[in-house]
Every structure is written in structure tokens, then in C-alpha cells.
């Protein structure tokens, strides 16, 4: 496993549409391992491969670790897709490792049904709600070149982007804060 650098806005790679994973190879498993290590180190609860400059449809997630009880439940989703969504919506405050130190309320479908392949090559369909639904939608958005700030007002999005563009021009490097 290796720690990888997380790219941040305004990096144009974050706007790429990621390519499907053709086969679950040792290289894909190694990439997932690197993503878990990077996600835990950041710390975060989800990471899309494009966030470490790998434009493939792979997501890692661990929602259990967020609870701070020392337990983990790492999950990898290869070629995930939303195949159904509720009309009911829910608002969660979202953040992103690629947009450090910024959070905003985002409205998304409250429940979604997803299809994905696991690291053993098995295809699954699963219903997601609550934080899981929000997180999987957020990460799938990354695979499609969409950021959570695309779901907020144009004015707020412009202010956020201006902040990061100015910082990038000055050479300032945002580093996610470590938690104790």
C-alpha cells in the first residue's frame, strides 16, 4: 500500500469522466489498497480514484470508521452505477477531500439502488439510504466529473472556486487537517 496525493480544485482532472474498469486485476486491487490508505490518512469516509489522478471507475468507502470506535468496514465499488432513486430527498452537509475546509448542504435523493462489482469480481445490487446514499452519490458524481459544489448555488460555487484558484496561483497547498 502507498499513500497517494489527493488532487484539489481547481485541478482540471477532477472534471474528467472516469473510464470503466475492464477486469478486476491485481493492479486494480493495489489501487484500491492505495486508496484506502490515502482515505484513512486524510482522513475521509470516501474516495474516488480520480481524486488521486487515476481516471477509472473505482470508489473506496468506510462509513463505520467515521463513528470513531476503532472499527472499520472498508468497501470498494468498481464501476458503480445508480439504477434507481427515490423521489424523496434529504439534505446533508457535505465536504470533500478535493475541496478542503469547505462544507455545504446538498440535497440528494434519500435512497438509491446501486449496481457495482466488488474486488472479487462479483456483481451486486444494493439499496442505500442515509449517509451511505449521500456518500455513494457524492463519489459516483466524482467518477462523472461532477463536484458537490455543482449542487449549490452558482454564486456560492463561484466564491469557492475563486478562493481555490487564488490559492493555487499563490502556490498555497491546502492540506486536510488531521484529527486526533
Swiss-Prot record:
Its cofactor is Fe(2+). Binds 1 Fe(2+) ion. Its EC number is 3.5.1.88. It holds the Pfam family Pep_deformylase. GO terms for biological process: co-translational protein modification; translation. Fe cation binds at residues 96, 138, 142. InterPro entries: Peptide_deformylase, Peptide_deformylase_sf. The active site is at residue 139. CDD domains: Pep_deformylase. One of its GO terms (molecular function) is peptide deformylase activity. It catalyses: N-terminal N-formyl-L-methionyl-[peptide] + H2O = N-terminal L-methionyl-[peptide] + formate. Disulfide bonds: none annotated. Keywords: Hydrolase, Iron, Metal-binding, Protein biosynthesis. Belongs to the polypeptide deformylase family. Removes the formyl group from the N-terminal Met of newly synthesized proteins. Requires at least a dipeptide for an efficient rate of reaction. N-terminal L-methionine is a prerequisite for activity but the enzyme has broad specificity at other positions. This is Peptide deformylase. The lineage of its organism: Bacteria, Pseudomonadati, Pseudomonadota, Alphaproteobacteria, Hyphomicrobiales. The gene is def.
